[in-house]
Amino acid sequence: MALETVPKDLRHLRACLLCSLVKTIDQFEYDGCDNCDAYLQMKGNREMVYDCTSSSFDGIIAMMSPEDSWVSKWQRVSNFKPGVYAVSVTGRLPQGIVRELKSRGVAYKSRDTAIKT
């Protein structure tokens, strides 16, 4: 697991609304999302960080070998990079971003386990 994917602080944590990766707001702005930056372009853009992440999430899981873990398969993160992931993320991506993802062939499924989509 790369050191930059581990949250550097327990305050100001946010979870990506697309993949549920958890980092500090500054880490998302400085490095982007390790899994989704090709689509969400959060790196260097604090406004996109606020739009594409949520500070409201439940539970965290540290994934060292996502490809070998049954938990990562259950959480739908087995194809993602090692890191810390939220179990459930409250919120949805803005409609414009969802349309852009769809046009690029990326299916968006909410990571909020409280709502069924």
From Swiss-Prot:
CDD domains: Spt4. InterPro entries: RPABC4/Spt4 (IPR029040), Spt4 (IPR009287), Spt4/RpoE2_Znf (IPR022800), Spt4_sf (IPR038510). Transmembrane segments: none annotated. SMART domains: Spt4. Its main location: nucleus. It comes from the Eukaryota. GO terms for molecular function: protein heterodimerization activity; RNA polymerase II complex binding; zinc ion binding. The modification N-acetylalanine is found at A2. Keywords: Acetylation, Activator, Metal-binding, Nucleus, Repressor, Transcription, Transcription regulation, Ubl conjugation, Zinc, Zinc-finger. It holds the Pfam family Spt4. GO terms for biological process: negative regulation of DNA-templated transcription, elongation; negative regulation of transcription by RNA polymerase II; negative regulation of transcription elongation by RNA polymerase II; positive regulation of DNA-templated transcription, elongation; positive regulation of transcription by RNA polymerase II; regulation of DNA-templated transcription; regulation of transcription elongation by RNA polymerase II; transcription elongation by RNA polymerase II. Residues 2-40 are annotated as: Interaction with SUPT5H. Widely expressed. A zinc finger (C4-type) spans 16-36. Ubiquitinated by UBR5 when not assembled in the DSIF complex, leading to its degradation: UBR5 recognizes and binds a degron that is not accessible when SUPT4H1 is part of the DSIF complex. GO terms for cellular component: DSIF complex; nucleoplasm; nucleus. Zn(2+) binds at C16, C19, C33, C36. It is found in: Nucleus. Component of the DRB sensitivity-inducing factor complex (DSIF complex), which regulates mRNA processing and transcription elongation by RNA polymerase II. DSIF positively regulates mRNA capping by stimulating the mRNA guanylyltransferase activity of RNGTT/CAP1A. DSIF also acts cooperatively with the negative elongation factor complex (NELF complex) to enhance transcriptional pausing at sites proximal to the promoter. Transcriptional pausing may facilitate the assembly of an elongation competent RNA polymerase II complex. Belongs to the SPT4 family. PANTHER family: SUPPRESSOR OF TY 4 (PTHR12882), TRANSCRIPTION ELONGATION FACTOR SPT4 (PTHR12882:SF1). Interacts with SUPT5H to form DSIF. DSIF interacts with the positive transcription elongation factor b complex (P-TEFb complex), which is composed of CDK9 and cyclin-T (CCNT1 or CCNT2). DSIF interacts with RNA polymerase II (Pol II); forms DNA and RNA clamps that stabilize Pol II elongation complex while maintaining the nontemplate DNA strand in the transcription bubble and nascent RNA in the exit channel. This interaction is reduced by phosphorylation of the C-terminal domain (CTD) of POLR2A by P-TEFb. This is Transcription elongation factor SPT4. The lineage of its organism: Eukaryota, Metazoa, Chordata, Craniata, Vertebrata. The gene is SUPT4H1.
